[in-house]
Amino acid sequence: MSIVVTGATGHLGRLVVHQLLEKVPAEQVTAVVRDEAKAADFAARGVKLAVADYNRPETFDGLFAAGDKVLLISGNEFDKGRVGQHTVVIDAAKAAGVALLAYTSAPGSLTAALADDHRATEQVLLASGLPYTLLRNGWYHEVYTENLAPVLAHDAVVAAAGAGRLSSASRADYAAAAVAVLTGEGHENQTYELGGDEAWSFAEYAAELSRQTGREIAYNSVPGETKLGILKDAGIPEPLASILVGVDASIAEGELVISTGDLSRLAGRPTTPLAEAVAAGLKG
């Protein structure tokens, strides 16, 4: 039996693999990667590597084995039919008879277009008959704290979210939840709504940035069309920019406030405070 992690060299995947290695022997972990060279550090620690690509279904033939636990980390290629990509993995997992397939989805409360592929993937997974766990991940601190250059250049946080609040958490928090599911028992056919312990507004985020930098950083709430133009001017492709503006609209409606406590319970600790993520982002 192996614990198999797809997208293992991505931001979340790397954290999952590293945290798995704190709990299970390396030979029980398989990292699915597109580029073996990017996973050399995993191989050096004894992790098994499997080279496969969501866009090449044949590369998943025989990759899984009966009894495996699989983490399907959602793809980030918004223009390549993510549902089809995910279905490739689900079909291969079903053919192998895996013991569990956990999928990193989106909050059940999210109505933004970002959620569409996740909802469709969930339906494919449920229809497969596989034992499943839906890890409905909320928003990541790092979406904001790893992109501070424009904020610091203009002394302003800009969002089309009004006074809306969100309960984000760090990638490491979501990774810890996934590891708990992959290494624990009793998670079959469960859905977890995952978010940070504390909700915050963009005005509060700007205030925290001001506190840590000693500068006056404002929050500018703008219409969605204005935010779309800003993102496109920054070189973000329109499809992704539109998705991000849609998320802002969902934040304005409170759709990214997740108050279940599922994330901290699975992680076995409180979630990472926003202030800590801001400090890390400022250090670069």
Predicted regions and their residues:
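Short loop/helix-cap segments at secondary-structure boundaries that form the rim of catalytic
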Residues: 38-45, 62
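A hydrophobic C-terminal alpha-helical subdomain
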Residues: 225-284
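Rossmann-fold cofactor-recognition segment
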Residues: 43-55
